Amino acid sequence: MYLAYIFFLFATVSAIPTGRVEIVFPSVETSRSGMKTVKFRALGEDVELKLEPAGDILAQDFALYNGNQEKQQSVNVESLRRRLYRDSANGAALLIDDDEQPPSIEGIVFSKLRISPHEWKEVTEEGKRAHQVEELTSDRDSYLSDDILIPDFQREMVSFTRIDRNDKCIVIEVLLVTDRKFTERCETNEALTEYVTLLSSVTEALFRQLDSGWQLRLLGIMTFTNETEPPLFEESKHPNGAYKPVFVNKINDYFRENPTSLSKNADIIGILLTRSMRDRMDDWYSFEGLAFGNSVCSGNKACAINAYEKAEQAAYNLAHEMAHSLGIFHDGEFYRCVPEEVSEVISCPNSNYIMGYNSGDNYGKIFRMF
């Protein structure tokens, strides 16, 4: 018997279409303390970021593993850790590579602007590298919505405070898993690790904008390939390659029956797919993410998202589904099937729309953090 309810996140076109685009030449200054200041002007705004190191999002023993639980040595974790920066006040999560000159910057700012190195690497201005800034937007023709399945409660709930790591905030420990198609999409292990790390950093930045007190800690990454991917992945697909929603049930059972140290320690196990999910192959809509509700209280840890090619866009899906796993509903919604103490511990203000729902008071406000 599965816990209480499952959230189905579906989209008609794309979760986060791209708005305005502009080429910028950001400056990067580093202080003796390790803080960085990044400045640029984009879309009519002067941007100044005061960035602090954010390598703590990676666990101390963070590593990349293959599907056989073998640690991969091809990734320089400490170098990656040093490149991670955040400015919580401005909703910024960035990967800054100082080894390249001029420095390259990739990530999100104000929770609504994506910045990345321009493909014309040789284009510079006064020693500054060209970058592209894209506005992430939502519109009425491209939105996310949910459906809910509510079976009976059969599992005893445990205290939400079990994930309190005695830190100043609540630390959510996460294991992210890639299907074989996602693994193949990344040219190298390093590229895959950078994508997943940036995905996690942007997801945390979105949570910080909600004043949630949540901090993510990425325990590790598990990558499946043709040789190691469990049969349940193919068994859960339609002929056109889209996953069936039952996939989340099956992958949840898989980690229950085949636990590893990472999966046992994780509060949430996120599965990164390269396809959406559909009830029927010819459905007009597709699920872009699925999650068990209140998984931190039940042991049903799995959630899955369609991980778009841009990590900054996929982060909206991951943040939405992880929030459901932690007991958050859509803005303005409440389900009586959820224990009262959970709903009181975690609440989502109506002014934040990462948990928006395309109906009622929140019509047209889907995934707007600004």
From Swiss-Prot:
Glycosylation sites: 226
Cellular compartment(s): Secreted
Keywords recorded for this protein, A-Z: Glycoprotein, Hydrolase, Metal-binding, Metalloprotease, Protease, Secreted, Signal, Toxin, Zinc
Active-site feature positions: 321
Main location: secreted
Listed transmembrane segments: none
Tissue spec. comment: Expressed by the venom gland.
GO molecular function: metal ion binding; metalloendopeptidase activity; toxin activity
GO cellular component terms, A-Z: extracellular region
Keyword Protease applies: yes
Family that this chain belongs to: Belongs to the venom metalloproteinase (M12B) family.
Purpose: Metalloprotease that may disrupt the cell matrix and the process of clotting blood or hemolymph.
Protein name per its UniProtKB record: Metalloproteinase
Source organism of this protein record: Tityus obscurus
Top-level taxonomy: Eukaryota, Metazoa, Ecdysozoa, Arthropoda, Chelicerata
